[in-house]
């Protein structure tokens, strides 16, 4: 909010934050689906932790099903979906089969890393566009 120049001391009607941390993957997907189906004019959904919508990030079938669900939501509700998935420790590859599927289907993949010169700064680079 601060980076966008928006006030941080009051709620905004056009931003809705939903915490699904304690929900199962199936329940989280149901909640997202319900919200998309019952709210109007949603233009952007940010899923910080796409891994939390899966039981097994290395399952090819579960990965494909989740990617298909994201694509369905994107098309059906005419919105952009931004997901966050961490990289493998030690290399620049996204984690699990879901990482491979996201890379294959994503419009743009961005990598966010801490600056080597200042740990208080994050650097963003395009892995592919």
List where the protein language model places each region:
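Conserved inter-motif catalytic segment of the P-loop NTP-binding fold
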Residues: 1-61
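Phosphate-binding/switch region of NTP-binding enzymes
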Residues: 44, 52, 61-129
